[in-house]
Amino acid sequence: MIFQRTVKEMVKTTGVGLHSGNKVTLIIKPAPVNTGIKLVRTDLSPAVEIPAVADQVRETTMCTALVNDDGVRISTIEHLFAALAGLGIDNAVIEVDAPEIPIMDGSASPFVFLLQSVGIQEQNAAKKYIKITKPIRVEDGDKWAELKPFKGFRVDFAIDFNHPEIARSQQHMVMDFSSSAFIKDISRARTFGFMRDIEYLRANNLALGGSMENAVVLDEYRVLNPDGLRYEDEFVKHKILDAFGDLYVAGHAIVGEFCAYKTGHALNNQLVRAMLAQQDAWEIVSFEKEADAPVSFSVPAGAVFA
């Protein structure tokens, strides 16, 4: 059987909030089977829990933010969620003492390291997958995103930026998902932004924590970071990383093909909502034999049932 997963023990880190520029403490705790991913604002009294589900995503400008009915928010969840999805973690409680997840280095890699440092524990319940049985598509002008039936999880993603540095890079990528492919090829890709936008955002009290330490920064012609890019195609890879995180608010790993052109957080969430609403287009499945599982996650060392 393919089992559900959580972290073996609590793990804690600190970082900077992208928009506030303030110090943020993040704690990831194990959770029982069928908990899903829950986020908790511990800086509020009493603490406020926000479930990581698609209809709680109520802000998608520059990041993915969960917002409850009282307006309590947790922003910039997508890189952490990409790491959780990439390592196949089904159940966890995420505590944060600020309105945003720390940006770390602008990629998912620090979260992958954090999760791997404490280990992943298999639990005594079957892992659930969302298997796509009919195509679901959403569009916004020339942008579109689609989920289609596929035995596995494949991503076919294209971006189109009219910028000389990005245009020189590969702007289209197809990959068959596995934990190892995610960690090696996707997880280190950083968010990117343009100097002109950063100046405007800072003037409006946003992106106060943004820097070349946690983003690829471009002017009109080139990358400004002294160390350059981590991957030649880092731009499209980061958009894929974002999509992994955005799709994980569906609640389970997806068995299907995700195809997208020029999508961002808003359209990714729109696609998840459209999928969940179209209940004849998917089904929940589990797999008795590992050989039958179409999506490959890294095997935790010395897995112990919880």
Swiss-Prot record:
GO terms for biological process: lipid A biosynthetic process. It is an enzyme of class 3 (hydrolase). It comes from the Bacteria. Zn(2+) binds at H79, H238, D242. Its cofactor is Zn(2+). The active site is at H265. One of its GO terms (cellular component) is membrane. Pathway: Glycolipid biosynthesis; lipid IV(A) biosynthesis; lipid IV(A) from (3R)-3-hydroxytetradecanoyl-[acyl-carrier-protein] and UDP-N-acetyl-alpha-D-glucosamine: step 2/6. GO terms for molecular function: metal ion binding; UDP-3-O-acyl-N-acetylglucosamine deacetylase activity. Its EC number is 3.5.1.108. InterPro entries: Ribosomal_Su5_D2-typ_SF, UDP-acyl_GlcNac_deAcase, UDP-acyl_GlcNac_deAcase_C, UDP-acyl_N-AcGlcN_deAcase_N. Disulfide bonds: none annotated. Keywords: Hydrolase, Lipid A biosynthesis, Lipid biosynthesis, Lipid metabolism, Metal-binding, Zinc. Pfam families: LpxC (PF03331). It catalyses: a UDP-3-O-[(3R)-3-hydroxyacyl]-N-acetyl-alpha-D-glucosamine + H2O = a UDP-3-O-[(3R)-3-hydroxyacyl]-alpha-D-glucosamine + acetate. Belongs to the LpxC family. Catalyzes the hydrolysis of UDP-3-O-myristoyl-N-acetylglucosamine to form UDP-3-O-myristoylglucosamine and acetate, the committed step in lipid A biosynthesis. HAMAP family: LpxC. This is UDP-3-O-acyl-N-acetylglucosamine deacetylase. It comes from Shewanella pealeana (strain ATCC 700345 / ANG-SQ1).
